From Swiss-Prot:
Belongs to the class-V pyridoxal-phosphate-dependent aminotransferase family. NifS/IscS subfamily. The keyword Iron applies. Master enzyme that delivers sulfur to a number of partners involved in Fe-S cluster assembly, tRNA modification or cofactor biosynthesis. Catalyzes the removal of elemental sulfur atoms from cysteine to produce alanine. Functions as a sulfur delivery protein for Fe-S cluster synthesis onto IscU, an Fe-S scaffold assembly protein, as well as other S acceptor proteins. Homodimer. Forms a heterotetramer with IscU, interacts with other sulfur acceptors. It is an enzyme of class 2 (transferase). The lineage of its organism: Bacteria, Pseudomonadati, Pseudomonadota, Gammaproteobacteria, Alteromonadales. The keyword Iron-sulfur applies. This is Cysteine desulfurase IscS. It comes from the Bacteria. GO terms for cellular component: L-cysteine desulfurase complex. Pathway: Cofactor biosynthesis; iron-sulfur cluster biosynthesis. InterPro entries: Aminotrans_V_dom, Aminotrans_V_PyrdxlP_BS, Cys_deSase_IscS, Cysteine_dSase, PyrdxlP-dep_Trfase, PyrdxlP-dep_Trfase_major, PyrdxlP-dep_Trfase_small.
Length: 404
């Protein structure tokens, strides 16, 4: 068993060896290294063919037409292109956008930028289980609303939104619906023929593909128009200029094909390991799961251990590669804004750990994790005066702390 045990699959996944092997064939002189836009020789034609195959593989993952797939550098770029692209193209129609407080920073900061440009953004509060109620979304809609951007699966707590219902509501009101599927593509079935979603952001490195590659699904019927954010040679039907990175695109395509073929078996195995982990630690006193337990992606478990400081817990769990929130904001010592939006107080938000399990996690690793967590919590609480006060029956919310 390799230490530390990797339990941070929501931050990134290792590239599947089958994907890596395929990618190597598209880099060197011995392989297919040409520019897919070179139309005058075989090197270019072969590269273009490889890109076409990968485009089809990504399209098949979500049951789309291959012409609806635009390759980007990742979900952050896809989110920027979708949100800014719609806002700038449709701004004559309206300048109001709806999103939620628990979105990824790539959506929230893009919306903040649009606010600086004169757009108005409504940030919806989720329920305590992390889910946005439909009536709250509907109540926020206005005549000048042009876009709703709600993630499919939350990156910190793993809850799944009812994107079918959101899509129906948006379509009935003539509002464009963008869905950030970085955490769900390749893990949950997505079918654009049945779900009325107009734009979908996809990330390669969240589904055992390489980093630095992603895609944006852009619906053709009814047709969604975007204003390009990256200008140049007019690649990707003018929506995203820049030489296509054949080896990374091939990697994304292969990862999508594997995910589609193995999704059901992967999910069943991962859910079993996730349940084993939760059943192994839920007996620890004052331990709570964050987010809805039924509407949840199989590999995710966000747990708060009351009266334990999150950072000290992370240090105590040095054999486990876990995080206390999203990797993109884990460098800051602020409590997770996602957990705060769920109504957790700072202490509970600070004492939370995100465990995310994936394709290469083993049962032996979960056993070791349970043992490590149990021992670490016991040790840290032994040293905690707050735990002692709690055990003595003192209500810590009523304590008047002296400020020096």
């Amino acid at each position: 068993m390799k230490l530390p045990i990797y339990l941070d699959y929501a931050a990134t996944t290792p590239v599947d060896p089958r994907v890596a092997e395929k990618m190597f064939q598209y880099m060197t002189m011995d392989g297919i290294f040409g520019n897919p836009a070179s139309r005058s020789h075989r090197y270019g034609w072969q590269a273009e063919e490889a890109v076409d195959v990968a485009r089809n593989q990504v399209a098949e993952l979500i049951n789309a037409d291959h012409r609806e797939i635009v390759f980007t550098s990742g979900a952050t770029e896809s989110n920027n292109l979708a949100i800014k692209g719609v806002a700038h193209f449709y701004n004559k129609k309206g300048k109001h956008i709806i999103t939620s407080k628990t979105e990824h920073k790539a959506v929230l900061d893009t919306c903040r930028q649009l606010e600086r440009e004169g757009f108005e953004v409504t940030y919806l509060e989720p329920e305590a289980n992390g889910i946005i109620p439909m009536e709250r979304l509907e109540a926020a809609m206005r005549d000048d609303t042009i876009l709703v951007s709600i993630m499919h699966v939350n990156n910190e707590i793993g809850v799944i939104h009812d994107v079918d219902a959101i899509g129906e509501l948006c379509r009935s009101k003539g509002i464009i619906f963008h869905m950030d599927a970085a955490q769900s593509a390749g893990k949950l079935p997505i079918d654009v023929q049945t779900t009325k979603v107009d734009l979908i952001s996809i990330s390669g490195h969240k589904m055992y593909g390489p980093k630095g590659i992603g895609a944006l699904y852009v619906r053709r019927k009814p047709r969604i128009r975007l204003e390009a954010q990256m200008h140049g040679g007019g690649h990707e039907r003018g929506m995203r200029s820049g030489t296509l990175a054949t080896h990374q695109i091939v990697g994304l395509g292969e990862a999508a094909a594997i995910a589609k073929a193995e999704m059901a078996t992967d999910n069943a195995r991962i859910a079993k390991l996730r349940d084993k982990l939760w059943n192994g630690i839920k007996h620890i006193e004052e331990t709570y799961v964050n987010g809805d337990m039924t509407h949840r992606v199989s590999g995710s478990l966000n747990v708060s251990f009351n009266y334990v400081e999150g950072e000290s817990l992370m240090m105590a769990l040095k054999d486990l590669a876990v995080s206390s929130g999203s990797a993109c904001t884990s460098a800051s010592l602020e409590p997770s804004y996602v957990l705060r939006a769920l109504g957790l107080n700072d202490e509970m938000a600070h004492s939370s750990i995100r465990f995310s399990i994936g394709r290469f996690t083993t049962e032996e690793e979960i056993d070791h994790a349970i043992e490590t967590i149990t021992q670490s919590i016991d040790k840290l609480r032994e040293m905690s005066p707050l735990w002692e006060m709690f055990k003595d029956g003192i209500d810590l919310n009523q304590v008047q702390w002296a400020h020096h």
